[in-house]
Amino acid sequence: MRIIGLDVGTKTVGVALSDPLGITAQPFETITRKENNKLRRTYARIEQIISEYDVTEIVVGYPKNMDDTIGERAKACEEFAAALERRTGLPVTLWDERLTTVEADEVLEECGMRRENRKTVIDQLAAVFILRGYMESKQK
């Protein structure tokens, strides 16, 4: 009954997983998107994680603009989420991700992590914030 949270960017996808009970969210990995593979390898890796960890639900960060409008990145996330739903047959929820990367960067800075080292984990941490927000809303 795990849930996977995804922070989809143009170059990377941050991945977070819930525990089997769906209570906590942990950083899992960052998938690097290479231009030449388009999204095929990205989808394949996500599908592999879903299979290995018995994921039953997918949450994709939805980067709305601060004025609540839908921009190009949000449209790309809508397409990504729709493709994941088609490919996996699992329910996919778009979750407002405004400022999650900023929040993740601030947390890493407070922990004393150097800026150049943050790149490897910032997307995973943003995915944790997306997933945690979604799970907390379900508990209410």
UniProtKB/Swiss-Prot annotation:
It is found in: Cytoplasm. SUPFAM superfamilies: Ribonuclease H-like. GO terms for molecular function: nuclease activity. Belongs to the YqgF nuclease family. InterPro entries: RNaseH-like_sf (IPR012337), YqgF (IPR005227), YqgF/RNaseH-like_dom (IPR006641), YqgF/RNaseH-like_dom_sf (IPR037027). It comes from Lachnospira eligens (strain ATCC 27750 / DSM 3376 / VPI C15-48 / C15-B4). This is Putative pre-16S rRNA nuclease. Keywords: Cytoplasm, Hydrolase, Nuclease, Ribosome biogenesis. Gene3D superfamilies: YqgF/RNase H-like domain. GO terms for biological process: rRNA 5'-end processing. GO terms for cellular component: cytosol. Pfam families: RuvX. Could be a nuclease involved in processing of the 5'-end of pre-16S rRNA.
